[in-house]
Amino acid sequence: LNFERSFLFYYLYLPKQTFTPYPFETVVENEIFTEFIALTRENILQDYKLICESRQASLLGRRDVMGGRAKFGIFGDGKELAQIAMAKAFQKGDFRSGYYRDQTVVAALDGLTWRAFFSQLYGHADVAFDPNTAGRSMNNHYTTRYLDENGAWKSQTDTYNHICDLAPTGGQMPRSLGLAYASKLYRHNKELAHLANFSQQGNEIVFATIGDASTSQGMFWETMNAAAVLQVPLLTSVWDDGYGISVPVSYQTAKESISKALAGLQRTANEPGMEILTVKAWDYVALLETYQKAARICRQEQVPVLVHVQEVTQPQGHSSSGSHERYKNPDRLAWEQECDCNVRFKNWILTNGYATLEELEAIDNAAKKQIREERNEAWEVFQHSIKTEQEQAIGRIEAAAQTSNASPELLKLADDLRREASPLHRDATTAVRKALRLLRFEESTTKSELDHWLKENKAINEDRFSSHLYSQSAESPLKVAAVGAQYDEKPAMVDGREVVRANFDALFTNDPRLVALGEDVGQIGDVNQGFAGLQEKHGKIRITDTGIRETTIIGQGIGLAIRGLRPIVEIQYFDYVYYALATLTDDLATLLYRTKGGQKAPLIIRTRGHRLEGIWHSGSPMAVVVHSLRGLHVCVPRNLTQAAGMYNTLLRGDDPALVVEPLNGYRLKEALPLNLGDFCVPLGQPEVLRLGTDATIVTYGSMCRIVLEAAEQLAQIGVEIEIIDVQTLLPFDLDHTILASIKKTNRVIFADEDMPGGGTGYMLQQVMDTQNAYRWLDSAPRTISAKAHRPSYSSDGDYFSKPNVEDVFEITYELMSDAEPERFPKI
């Protein structure tokens, strides 16, 4: 490095490529690109301006929390300089997958205005003002809205892409692997070249960011190992400030250094792995050099890189929840002031003569003024929409008071609402709801106006805070119509596994975007042969084996789905879903919701469950996933033909989903359809498997066969059971098929293989609460479930742990005996 008064130059030699590094110019010399980075006085002072703005935003943000304007604040102060350097290595089409510390890099890439920064801090529930999360995430969670207002994809190659940040520490890592893996697929699978809005020949790299304490999480280590195995362009920055809130690194990390702890993954001349670089958070020149080098290795060589950014400071501690003076001694606090990256950068500028002290103070003062102005604008706009509602509510309550017997109470409500200096949306709604209580014995035009206002306001707030749990686009899988399976007059009867395999073959033949991955999926075609022979036909790059790492299998799928591919990833057995549950519930299930329709990841998770053998190969934890994975569709096919039809439906839609295939159905014979890949099972529409008049049994999955067999035995004694296969738990019975059946039979039993109160409890709530079916019952509803323990091993263990034919028969008989004891005496 050579220093001059006006310019700082350094050189990097790169292989010839089609991309143009950002933000500097590139020239061609003898088939070699020479990247000539010229940092002018103007560049340097622009960087100084940005770090001053970012720091001031952090300081004012904390002040607003302490002053009551915002509920909570967490900021990126102390990391400004490293993020400036990272931004200079970013190119359009690249991705950032991070957490709540990255405000400076987002601002450097023009993805953040400071007004939007404060709008998010205040919780402004409007995409126009908080385009990142529409007030649904706390502050410092950033999003590139890669979906248009109709939910359709926009180009990802002409923007700097930020995947909506996560607060659960380490949660951003699994999807980072998938985002980087997508670049590998786009680079090596030429059949994807037409998807130019998603990739330019796989030249995109992924910048993941994580705090040093969060590197203790298992998903971080799983991601690092998988990235090194897969050799994907993942550039991970670890912001190391030496603490996890109050817990020092000595309690967190082996050797008190994540770069030392990861040294075994360092690549060598003979062994692939990852590149590990270290740099100080306050060293401007070294940061620039390190990030340019890291990005070059990552982009050109397709090698993962970890940049361990050391000696990061926390000027305000972890968050607004408390002061770091509680757990840092005076020497540490003094060191943090001395090594503050903004202070060091200022001194470096002065030492090298790029500006005078007066010039830097002028920049600092201008930054403070700008941040104050944008913060005040954000607050004013935030309050305006709320105060409009406040005034509307006050006016309507006072109007109602003029003719009401409860006038004093109503006027007090209006006066209390008027005195709210910094009201929230809830305040007007609360006041109107209380007013309507007071008016419950009266009828008037003003009461009707209050009621009308409340209903309109409820719809507005439903959109503000509860929309986009599922797709609202034209591609919603709920809009995919049913297409029946077609058969020969004498169809071939094959194992169920052959039906789903043939269907996957048809799908992969017709859509190059499809990718399947998971343990044993590739070479042997999965443990139940649903992909047998398909890797050989469609290639290893499309049907791929993975290690035993459920969390990053899901992460790979999320990243691929975000980048325009259609992955089907496998959790080998349903019991193993717990390994991946955090990533499923925190990231995948919430992505569309927490961006208010700005981002989606239409991933399909394939697994198999219900009953086979033993504690960990026969689980059916449906309540766990139903209550953890709102935002996904949960499909529970009774056989492999139904499963195939569900895959066909889901691949025509744009929501994520979990499909639980019946584990004991792969070798049962099924008719092979003719229209493979085309027949569709609609979501949320149960199927009546057997007509009856005496009672309705609602079930799904492998239990369908059990219940059907019991129904035949019950018919022999004069009990006719109507059997309904719900087919999907999310969504559940959209057309109220179950209600129609109960109106006929007046009795209902809910049966599944989950533990007591699990899936049966969910179905009971849906039918009794949502469908109000209780009005049609002549007998109390009953449930049939597995025992409260995990299923025991062996056929005997299955029989005494899971519901069986005799259980279904006897509980149904008890129901009939209670109703007609003479006809059905107790057994």
Each language-model region and where it sits:
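Thiamine diphosphate
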Residues: 80-84, 160-431, 533, 663-827, ...
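Short beta-strand segments
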Residues: 99-100, 176, 209-210, 236-240, ...
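Active-site phosphate/pyrophosphate-binding segments
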Residues: 599, 609-613, 617, 622, ...
